[in-house]
Amino acid sequence: MEEPRKTTRSAKPANESGSAKAVKPLTIFVDGEFVPEEDAKVSVFDHGLLYGDGIFEGIRFYNGRVFRLEEHLDRLWDSARSICLDLPMSRSEMTEAVLETIRKNDLRDGYIRLIVTRGVGNLGLNPTQCKRPSVIIIATTIALYSKEMYQNGLTVVTVATRRTGPGALNPAVKSLNYLNNVMARIEANLAEADEALMLNDQGCIAECTAEALRGITRSIVFEIAAELGIKISEVDISRHDVFIADECLLSGTAAEVIPVVKADGRVIGTGKPGPISLRMIARFREITREGGTPIYS
């Protein structure tokens, strides 16, 4: 799950001395310039706004290092190629822009939203009218779920909104068009559940509200499972499989790794985060602190 439901700006110190630092307005990267957040604007004719025509990546950074940056950029470039979007920056320029955005905001731990829109065009749908894509980079802190939710687990509810099929929009593209996910989120809110469980047209579980692509956090969970000697099987699953599971967890860049303890009102396992989930979470947090692209070097 890559989509933050709640974003906060932390008043915790960004330096290592422990001294308090006042919360200050964000500095945003917009098309090669760093501007105060109140001046970070896009045109009303940008096709990212008009049609959701664009792509994005959500990227975490921990302890002064950007986590799996190269993998996120690989996915960004793949998404761009898939939708015939010519990125206006080189790989090295994009990397430096991400790092400098974090530096401008004096952060060591947080979340990056890297956005590329089709750019300014007219009110027509034709993307050839957009002469140059727009790049926006936001660095901030994030709290998708509370500490208590990570300790106690989430509740999920199956929603009526079906996940958009790959024949309509390939899930490998991390598109700006998230209305399908938003509608599922609304259903979860109305049901007073923490997350929505989405099904595909065959009735198999597709995802929750924020992830349906080659998940980078998901791949790390697979790596951890291999370390722990846990067999991974990738198969289609239904609600039945969730109901009878001993443990269940969700993964995503913003959410990281978090247990699920109840689905559609039915308790999963003991109703508490299980031992495998807890080991996964602990190891994931270790890995995020072990490496990454240095921000301040």
Language model region names:
Residues 1-195, 201-204, 222-297:
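Conserved alpha/beta cores of soluble small-molecule-handling proteins
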Residues 204-211:
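Short, intrinsically disordered, charge-balanced linker/junction segments flanking boundaries
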Residues 212-225:
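Gly/Ser/Thr-rich active-site loops/lids in small-molecule metabolic enzymes
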